[in-house]
Amino acid sequence: MYRFKIYYPGKTKAKFIKEGIDHYIKLLSPFAKVELIELKEGHGDKEKVTEEESKTILNSLKGDFILLHRDGKSLSSTEFADFIKDKSLTQFVIGGVYGVNEAVFKAASFRLSLSSLTFTHEISRLLLLEQLYRAITIIHGKSYHY
């Protein structure tokens, strides 16, 4: 059984995103345990928020983690499946509204880009879960990825 931990600051506010997240967690449940770790959202100006949230992220993590970041490496869905298939625990970090600081960027064992497009941090949560489900179906030979 795979384990995925996804760390992010702030609540998921949009109802349709919450529903999508719940949908993919349910689809993943026969194959993986998914933990969403909602961290405290920072307050203040951009710099203060980024520093607060980044400190909270680093203090919450144990071990290696993958940072979702626009400057990360792009992988195809099959490459992503190969990347996670031998890991029992995979931890992901999604930054808040302003992203993360340099310390989080450097501490990441891998930086993954979901796209060269920019997405909100809430949409990124949903997209990551969809890609995790797609990867699991590729690994298990299920008909979802064509």
Curated annotation (Swiss-Prot):
It catalyses: pseudouridine(1915) in 23S rRNA + S-adenosyl-L-methionine = N(3)-methylpseudouridine(1915) in 23S rRNA + S-adenosyl-L-homocysteine + H(+). This is Ribosomal RNA large subunit methyltransferase H. InterPro entries: Alpha/beta_knot_MTases (IPR029028), RlmH-like (IPR003742), tRNA_m1G_MTases_N (IPR029026). It is an enzyme of class 2 (transferase). Homodimer. It comes from Thermodesulfovibrio yellowstonii (strain ATCC 51303 / DSM 11347 / YP87). Belongs to the RNA methyltransferase RlmH family. The gene is rlmH. Keywords: Cytoplasm, Methyltransferase, rRNA processing, S-adenosyl-L-methionine, Transferase. It comes from the Bacteria. One of its GO terms (cellular component) is cytoplasm. Specifically methylates the pseudouridine at position 1915 (m3Psi1915) in 23S rRNA. Its EC number is 2.1.1.177. One of its GO terms (molecular function) is rRNA (pseudouridine-N3-)-methyltransferase activity. PANTHER family: METHYLTRANSFERASE, RIBOSOMAL RNA LARGE SUBUNIT METHYLTRANSFERASE H. Pfam families: SPOUT_MTase. It is found in: Cytoplasm. S-adenosyl-L-methionine binds at residues 68, 95, 114-119. Its main location: cytoplasm.
